[in-house]
Amino acid sequence: MKYEIYFDESNKLDQKTDNYSYYGALGASIQIIDKLNDNVSQINGSLNSKSELHFVNYTNDDKFIKYFEVISYVLNQDIKINIMIVDNNDAKEIAEKMNISIVELRELFYVKIPERLFYGLARNLNSNESIDIIIDENSEYEKINLMTKLEEQMNAHSVYRNKGYKVSSVKQKSSENEIPLQIIDTIMGIIVFLVERNFEEQSSKAKIIKSDLIYRLLIHNNNLEKLHNLVNLYKWNNKSEDITLLDLSKYTGSFIIMKAEYDIKEITRLSKIMAKYPNKVTKFYREKMKYSNRQLRQLKGYISELEDKGRNNF
C-alpha cells in the first residue's frame, strides 16, 4: 500500500516580524487521499468554485460553505497532521552560538524538522509500505537539495529503527494542483490563528470573519473532538533536546470562550435592532450592525440562531 505525506510551512525564521515559525505535515493512505481529492472536487463543482483553499485568503465569508464543508469532511477522515512551532528568538540564539546566519540555520531546520514531522506520521506504518512525500513549491528547497536529503534521512530512520517502510520519492508540486497541500495550509493556518490569539483583534474585519468560520466549524457535531484527535501540536525551543507536545485544547478552549462572549454581545445587539425594525431585508440589518458585505454569512448565522434554527442552518 502507498502512503503520502504533504508538507508546508508558515512564517519563516528570517522574517523578522514573526515570533514563531510553523511547519506542518499531513499523512494518509493513497486511498484516503484519492477520496479527499474526489470529495473536494465535488464540493468545488457544486459551488462552481475554482479558487484554492488558503486560510490567509479567507477574508470574505462568501466562501464560507466551501471552507466549512471541506474542513468538516477532512476532520472526519483517517488523516493525521503533525505541526511544529519554532520559537524564532530561541532559534536566533542558537544561530549566534554556532556563529552562523539565520538563513543557514533555517536550512538546517529544513532537514531536521520535516524529518521529525514525517517520522511521526510514518513510524506506525506496516513493513514494505511505500511513501511519497509532496512539498509545496519553493525555489529555496532546490538550492539546498532538500528532496534528496529528506529521502535519505527518512530511509535511514527506517533502517535504523527496523521499520521496513521506504520513501520512494520526494517531490515539489504546486498547491494549485494538489488539494492536500491546500488542506494542510488551511488547517495549519487555523492552528496558527488560535495559537497566536489573532481572534482577540476585534477591530479587524478579516480576523472577525476568520473567527466566525473557525467557531462554527468547532461547534458543529463533534468537530472539536475530531480536530484534537487529528492534529498533534509540538513546540521546539533551545532549552531542551526533546520537542514538547502541546495541549491543543488549551488554545481551542480559550478561543471558544472568547468567541462565545463576543457572539452573545452581537446577537443581543442584533435582537434589539430586529425588535425595533421587524421584517426587514438582510441588507437592512447588515447595515444597521455596521457589517461589511463580506460578513453576510456571519449575520445570517446570528439571524438563524435568533430563529432557533441553529448557527449552521444553511
Features from the language model and the residues they span:
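Two-metal-ion RNase H-like nuclease active-site motif
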Residues: K2-D14
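Short, flexible loop/turn elements at secondary-structure junctions
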Residues: E9-N11, G27-S29, E137-S139
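Short secondary-structure boundary/capping segments within folded domains
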Residues: L13-T17, I71-V74
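Short helix/loop capping segments that flank catalytic or ligand/cofactor-binding pockets
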Residues: D14-K16, L36, K143-I144
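Acidic, metal-ligating active-site segments
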Residues: K16-I33, I187
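Compact, glycine/acidic-enriched structural inserts
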Residues: I32, L36-Y58
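Structured, acidic catalytic/metal-binding patches in enzyme active sites
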Residues: N48-D78, I85-N88, I102, I133
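Charge-dense, low-complexity intrinsically disordered regions
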Residues: I79-F314
